[in-house]
Amino acid sequence: MLKIDKDTHRIEGVEFYDSCNRDERPFDAVIDTIIVHCISLPLGEYNNDNIIDLFLNKLDISKHKSFSDLSNLRVSSHLLIKRKGDIVQFVPFNLRAWHAGQSCYNDRENFNDFSIGIELEGTSDSKFTKEQYSSLNEVVVALKSLYANIVNENILGHSDISPGRKQDPGDLFDWSKVK
């Protein structure tokens, strides 16, 4: 069972890379939402350090032609769940990661302010692994135990809060496997 340190707002025992692509949440922000994303760099290629490098502003854009659009991008997520279920944390949960971008859902905007962003290594048109679902569920349980305002109805896809702009986690993401 995962445990989140209440002082550091980090999951104990997981790999942590300190992304500078973050800032303070608004003073009155209440964490009550989880946003599920997916990412792979390059598209459909897994088990490399490109996502980590992107979130740390260290991505070598000469490594792949598709990286040229990412040269000045400053983004992060609180977590990345790799294909084998390994969890990597980039931003403590009490801080605002830069994952949602322009967002609106149910008359709420600026989802970075009150949400936790979780990236699954994958694409919006591929299936995710049982290990990823297992780790995601462990994370959800741990987050709910620390942030009482997170409820199942507030576990959303990036496509829910940015329709027309984002497709992730995609139609093959099995929401019935998320507790």
Please provide the spans of the model-predicted regions.
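Residues immediately flanking
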Residues: C38-I39, L120, S159
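N-terminal catalytic cores of peptidoglycan-degrading enzymes
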Residues: M1-E109
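Basic/polar, cationic surfaces and motifs that engage anionic cell-wall
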Residues: M1-E12, D28, E109-F114, T123-K179
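Hydrophobic transmembrane alpha-helix bundles
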Residues: D49, N112-G117
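Conserved, mostly hydrophobic/aromatic
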Residues: V36, I118, L136
